[in-house]
């Protein structure tokens, strides 16, 4: 919940940095290729007396190695940019509970968790601060809304405070079903798709 919005914001902030890094990488790529061409030309002339075929093979080998080196450099810079963006995304995730829209995000995560375990008698686990946000009247309203949606009596009992950044964990009373919608668990579950989205937007 809210992951796409956060990702888009961080990716937008990272674009300038990415452009700079990639520009440097491209310049280095050109320098590598230019140097390789000069080296190839020099060696080609040096061994020209041995035969045109040998000279051409040497030239092609040097250029192929240079292209491979340049490609490797670009891939390294791309991964570096993605990693920096992910780190910024994680930093922003930690700050999310301080934002005005966080309560709405938290409510949606609770509703999603209740849906995933199927309602009924449930235990709601939050961090200490979020238990202050979800007061008894909010909890009652959530129960009523979920009963109407699921057509099933749903009771949300507050459990112990957990050491999570934010979000929620929902458990059935018999502990057989658990929905971990903590912010960190949600981030980890979506890490591959977030990486793909960052790569798509930046490159």
UniProtKB/Swiss-Prot annotation:
Has multiple subunits with at least A(3), B(3), C, D, E, F, H, I and proteolipid K(x). Component of the A-type ATP synthase that produces ATP from ADP in the presence of a proton gradient across the membrane. It is a peripheral membrane protein. It comes from the Archaea. Keywords: ATP synthesis, Cell membrane, Hydrogen ion transport, Ion transport, Membrane, Transport. GO terms for cellular component: plasma membrane; proton-transporting two-sector ATPase complex, catalytic domain. Its main location: membrane. GO terms for biological process: proton motive force-driven plasma membrane ATP synthesis. Belongs to the V-ATPase E subunit family. Pfam families: vATP-synt_E. One of its GO terms (molecular function) is proton-transporting ATP synthase activity, rotational mechanism. It is found in: Cell membrane. This is A-type ATP synthase subunit E.
